[in-house]
Amino acid sequence: MINITKPQNWTRGDYLVSTDPALLQVDAINAALSSDMVWWAGDLPADALWDALRSSICFGLYRKRSSEMNGTGPTVEYKIEEWEQVGLVRMITDGVTFGYLTDVYILPEHQGGGRGRWMLQILNEALQGWPHLRRVMLLTTDKMHLFGKNLGMKDYREFDGMKGVSIAMVEGPGAQH
């Protein structure tokens, strides 16, 4: 189970996936959110984005700024200035029964090396440790195959228990399209 109070880290080559909120780079995240790549989001005032990030479990993807690594293993300290944020998976959750994935991205120049699959595999392993998890949801247009293959997600209408169920939502003033 993901320990919400204790950051966890995974490394592969020059890349790091971390749940450490101290590594999150608001300016980099906002730049991605305001890009065409993350068309559904849009940037936020820095303080509002920090509030959203702190209220979520964030799996940040970072690339080492230099080739000098400061060690390996669980005792390694990761310093924000040594890493460039290049991706994010943000999960809004109660930490027990439900999660909602949003703000999922990897910058285009860092795509294609299996890093998206790696991030989703880490997330999947974390979710498997939640004994009372009922469901994880997300909205997607053309990436369902990626989430299906790596997380086992399906269109909600494919679940037997969802026959006749409608998904309801209301858009707020900050909704982006």
UniProtKB/Swiss-Prot annotation:
> Which Pfam families has this protein been placed in?
Acetyltransf_1
> Can you tell which superkingdom this protein's organism belongs to?
Eukaryota
Note the CDD domains from the entry: NAT_SF
Q: What induces it?
A: Highly expressed under trichothecene-producing conditions.
Pathway(s) per entry: Mycotoxin biosynthesis
EC identifiers of the protein: 2.3.1.-
Name of this protein? Putative acetyltransferase FG08082
